[in-house]
Amino acid sequence: TLRILRSHIFNWLVWPDFSSIPDRHNPFLCFQEMRVDEVAKLGRGRFMKALPALHTVPAVAYQLSGEGGSLVFSGDTAYSEPLIAAINDIPDLRYLLVETAFPDALHDLALASRHLCPSLLALFLERIKSNPEVWITHLKPSRARTTLEEIAGYCGRFSPKALHNGLELTL
C-alpha cells in the first residue's frame, strides 16, 4: 500500500512527496504501515490503533485515544461485523466518524461499492453499545441534504451530524 501511495499519489504529479519536505531527515510526513490491531504510540499518552474495515480495496478504520477518551474514524467502509465488534471493545469511545456515501435511493450502489447509505448506517449503529457523538463523513454534495434527512429518520438515538470544516474534537 505504501508503494502504491508513493507511486500514484505522493509522486510530485498528484501531490508533493511530503516524506521528503523539507528534507528526508526531517520530513513533514512519515509513512508507517499498520496492520489491523496494531498500535502506534503517538506520545503524551496518545495512541492510534488500526481497526478492521470492509471496502472494495484493503481498508482500515482508526482508533485515536488520549486522556479524554477515544475517537474512531472509519474512512470508506461497508457494514462490517468485525469493525462493530472492535468499536464495542472501546470502553471510552466519545466520537465516531463514519462515512455515509449515498442516499438510500442508491442502496444497491452502496452495497456494490462497499459504502454505507442511511439504512445500512442505521443497522451499523444499532449494534454500537456505547453512545458516542456520531459525525458523518463522505457525503456527496449534491445529495447531502437528502442523505442527512434520511440519517435523521433512521438514527435518532445518536443524532448524527455532518462533519464540517472548523470542527474540533478533543481527546
Identify the meaning behind each predicted range.
Residues A85, L111-L120:
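Charged helix-capping and loop-helix junction motifs
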Residues H107-A112, L148-A152:
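Histidine/acidic-residue-rich catalytic or RNA/ligand-binding cores of hydrolases
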Residues T1-V72, A78-S80, A85-N88, R127-V134, ...:
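Binuclear metal-dependent hydrolase catalytic cores
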Residues F102-D104, R143:
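Feature marks short, surface-exposed loop/turn motifs that line or immediately flank catalytic pockets
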Residues L93-A101:
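Non-cysteine beta-strand/loop elements that form the S-adenosyl-L-methionine
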Residues H55, V98, A112-H115, H138:
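Histidine-centered active-site/metal-ligand motif
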Residues L121-R127:
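Histidine-anchored nucleotide/phosphate-binding helix
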Residues I4, D104-L109:
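A short acidic, helix-capping loop that chelates divalent metal ions and anchors anionic groups
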